[in-house]
Amino acid sequence: MRFVDEARIQVRAGKGGHGCLSFRREKFVPRGGPDGGNGGDGGSVYLRADNRLLSLYDFRLKRLYEAQNGRPGEGSQCDGRKGENLVLNLPVGTLVYAEGPEGEVLVADLSEPDAEVLVASGGRGGKGNEHFKSSTMRAPRFSQPGEPGEEFNLRLELKILADAGLIGLPNAGKSTFISQVSAARPKIAAYPFTTLTPNLGVMIDEVDPDRRMVIADIPGLIEGAHEGQGLGLRFLKHVERTRFLVHILSIEDVGDEDPWAGFSLVNEELRRFDAELGERRQIEVVNKIDLVSPERLEALKERARADGREVYFISARDDLGLEPLVQELWQVCESTARNEPIVRLEGLTDVEEEEFPEIEVIYTRE
């Protein structure tokens, strides 16, 4: 299935059923009173976070989603059946924006599994004429129509929720690293931009299988990424909610004059995209140490110590230096809070909180 992280849909709640205009008619009861039942409420539209889903692909195929209309009332004081609610399952981490008169409004952030929010309320069913009888109105010849359901145009934006985000220049070996520490099997090749979409991997502690860490690998960043260069800009949003970042630099991109220029370049792009993301806690990693001599490697380690940088030197391909790095990942993950908002619902009208509008009636001829 293709990875799709943005889609536009229209949701339409069900209409309320009309109230019934009816009078009791039985043998030997010439003046039976009103007995029209109420219409059923229309179905509402809900959004639910489902952690089994990883893409919005299905919402590119279908744009309109409608809940069921309420049934009209009937005679003998029979109320109409309520319309069935419609529940749309979305990936965890989906942001929901509604189009309003002043632009888009964030109405829901599905950042927790099984979180559910109401986005379009069904219309209320109309009252039957039996509802309007009184001591002064014995035979009301009118009933109330059902209300229309709410309708909204929504934009869905998926931001993957992960504990750690892998960032770096293209061809730094991020995909090889995630394949070594998790069960993820991304495409790996010796050329830039092998990773075209985010990959998710789950790292499981060998001692405690319930101890898990979700790692997101995004396409490599290049200079000018914040302006749309390369592939990274589109996917940077997928590391916005991570607890921390793992910044991987290939030893091939480590020079003599300024060995850490690659780190600085990517960090500058992060800051230009989002100032807070640029300050996110990072673990710096130099990968592919199998490509240099032991003397060159030792010189780089000495330079890192002299510059006061804590840099992990590894070879993801040959499984060199991974164990200390993995232990650091666990320690940082468990000591850092997740950057994720709570589920919220705002900006959309909840019909249940409104006063019932002035009665609209349907008259019949005498």
Swiss-Prot record:
CDD domains: Obg. PANTHER family: DEVELOPMENTALLY REGULATED GTP-BINDING PROTEIN-RELATED (PTHR11702), MITOCHONDRIAL RIBOSOME-ASSOCIATED GTPASE 2 (PTHR11702:SF31). Its cofactor is Mg(2+). Keywords: Cytoplasm, GTP-binding, Hydrolase, Magnesium, Metal-binding, Nucleotide-binding. The gene is obg. One of its GO terms (molecular function) is GTPase activity. Belongs to the TRAFAC class OBG-HflX-like GTPase superfamily. OBG GTPase family. Its main location: cytoplasm. It comes from Desulfovibrio desulfuricans (strain ATCC 27774 / DSM 6949 / MB). GTP binds at residues 168-175, 193-197, 217-220, 287-290, 315-317. It is found in: Cytoplasm. Residues 1-161 form the Obg domain. It holds the Pfam family GTP1_OBG. This is GTPase Obg. Mg(2+) binds at residues 175, 195.
